[in-house]
């Protein structure tokens, strides 16, 4: 099935994977590239998606945060093998408003909030006990009080410029459709060789 708008097709596939995928279907590989052209990739979780793009949250002091600050162009991959499908997205990062980041942060578990405050993500952890002690101290300090969102922890939206849908076929005759953004609301569609 092909749709005029790739977000509509993404929604159809996403609903299919939600029904058939036992593990977290929101897991997506995020690939970034530093200013010196060294790529890196890791799994992050999709928290929202819409016509505007694909949202995740992160510590901007982490390696991925630093690379995004240097180069806002990224790729995402959803590998949904259980339904023999994959979605690949290329786009540019835009930062969510502090209010949007605050709203999502408030929905996280208290432990996740405290961990986000205490973790120096991607830095060398020389003494794990010190980290655990800091978590315990902060837990006591904020007992019965809201845990403030650290300014470096924020939401990011990948605004898609290209979305490719891949579906497995017999004898490796796979189906691939590539949508390329032509303007704010328009897309061109081509089929690619497998």
Curated annotation (Swiss-Prot):
Its EC number is 1.4.3.5. GO terms for biological process: pyridoxine biosynthetic process. Keywords: Flavoprotein, FMN, Oxidoreductase, Pyridoxine biosynthesis. Pfam families: PNP_phzG_C, PNPOx_N. Binds 1 FMN per subunit. FMN binds at residues 42-47, 57-58, 63-64, 86, 121-122, 166, 176. This is Pyridoxine/pyridoxamine 5'-phosphate oxidase. It comes from Ehrlichia ruminantium (strain Gardel). The lineage of its organism: Bacteria, Pseudomonadati, Pseudomonadota, Alphaproteobacteria, Rickettsiales. The gene is pdxH.
């Amino acid at each position: 099935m092909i749709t005029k708008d790739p977000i509509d097709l993404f929604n159809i596939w996403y609903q299919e994977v939600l029904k058939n995928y036992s593990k977290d279907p929101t897991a997506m590989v995020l690939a970034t590239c530093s200013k010196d052209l060294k790529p890196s990739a890791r799994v992050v979780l999709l928290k929202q998606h819409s016509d505007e793009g694909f949202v995740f949250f992160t510590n901007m002091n982490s390696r991925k945060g630093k690379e995004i600050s240097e180069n806002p162009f990224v790729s995402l991959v959803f590998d949904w093998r259980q339904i023999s499908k994959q979605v690949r997205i290329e786009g540019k990062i835009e930062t969510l408003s502090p209010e949007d980041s605050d709203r999502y942060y408030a929905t996280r578990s208290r432990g996740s909030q405290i961990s986000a405050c205490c973790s120096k993500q991607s830095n060398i952890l020389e003494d794990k006990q010190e980290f655990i002690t800091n978590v315990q101290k902060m837990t006591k300090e904020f007992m019965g009080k809201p845990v403030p969102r650290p300014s470096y922890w924020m939401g990011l939206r990948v605004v898609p410029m290209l979305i490719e849908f891949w579906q497995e076929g017999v004898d490796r005759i796979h189906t691939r459709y590539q949508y390329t953004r032509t303007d704010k609301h328009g897309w061109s569609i081509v089929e690619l060789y497998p």
